[in-house]
C-alpha cells in the first residue's frame, strides 16, 4: 500500500514557507491506518520491546495501537504541567528557542527495552529529548519508528546510532 497517498500537504502552514504534512487522512482510512500500525508492529516484533513511548499528541495516535497490538504498555511524553505525578524532563531546541518535555519518573524501569513511536521525524529535537529521558530512567532505546520523515531537516543526525524505521519520506 502506498501510504504517501494518505498524507495531505498543506502549503504555508503553520507559517509562510512551511509545508505541513497532515496524517489525518491516513487515520481516517481504516485500511491505511491499520497497514501503518502493522508495519511498525512488524518492525518491533524481533526487538523484544517492553514498552512503547510516544510524544504528545500524535505519538499517542500512532503509539497506542502499536502497544495494544504487541500486548505491552504505553508511556506518554507530555509538555510540562500535563502529567499528575512526579516527572523528569528534558529540554530541546525548536526553531524559535527552547521547549521542554516530561514523562513520569516511574514510566520506565531500568533495563526495559523501549520503542519510541511518533508521527513525524523533522529536526529530531523531540525524539532526542525523549531518548534522554528514557536513558536517564535506565531504559534501553531499542528503536524509533515514525510514519513520516522530512528529508533535509537532519532528524536522522540527531538520533544517529539508534535503529530507526520510517514509513514515508517527504521533502523538508
Curated annotation (Swiss-Prot):
Pathway: Purine metabolism; AMP biosynthesis via salvage pathway; AMP from adenine: step 1/1
Presence of the UniProt keyword Transferase in the record: yes
Xref: Pfam families: Pribosyltran (PF00156)
PROSITE patterns, A to Z: PUR_PYR_PR_TRANSFER
Coiled coil: none
UniProt similarity note: Belongs to the purine/pyrimidine phosphoribosyltransferase family.
NCBIfam families found in the cross-reference section: apt, PRK02304.1-2, PRK02304.1-3, PRK02304.1-5
Protein name per the record: Adenine phosphoribosyltransferase
Organism: Streptococcus agalactiae serotype Ia (strain ATCC 27591 / A909 / CDC SS700)
Amino acid at each position: 500500500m502506498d501510504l504517501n497517498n494518505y498524507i495531505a500537504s498543506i502549503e504555508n502552514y503553520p507559517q509562510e514557507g512551511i509545508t505541513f504534512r497532515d496524517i489525518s487522512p491516513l487515520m481516517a482510512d481504516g485500511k491505511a491506518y491499520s497497514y501503518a500500525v502493522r508495519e511498525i508492529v512488524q518492525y518491533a516484533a524481533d526487538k523484544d520491546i517492553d514498552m512503547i513511548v510516544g510524544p504528545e499528541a500524535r505519538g499517542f495516535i500512532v503509539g497506542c495501537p502499536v502497544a495494544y497490538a504487541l500486548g505491552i504498555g504505553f508511556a506518554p511524553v507530555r509538555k510540562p504541567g500535563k502529567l499528575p505525578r512526579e516527572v523528569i524532563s528534558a529540554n530541546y531546541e525548536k526553531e524559535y528557542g527552547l521547549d521542554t518535555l516530561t514523562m513520569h519518573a516511574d514510566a520506565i524501569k531500568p533495563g526495559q527495552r523501549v520503542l519510541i513511536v511518533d508521527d513525524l521525524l523533522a529536526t529530531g529535537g523531540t525524539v532526542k529529548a525523549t531518548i534522554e529521558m528514557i536513558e536517564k530512567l535506565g531504559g534501553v532505546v531499542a528503536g524509533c519508528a515514525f510514519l513520516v520523515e522530512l528529508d533535509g531537516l537532519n532528524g536522522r543526525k540527531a538520533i544517529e546510532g539508534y535503529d530507526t524505521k520510517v514509513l514515508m519520506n517527504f521533502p523538508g
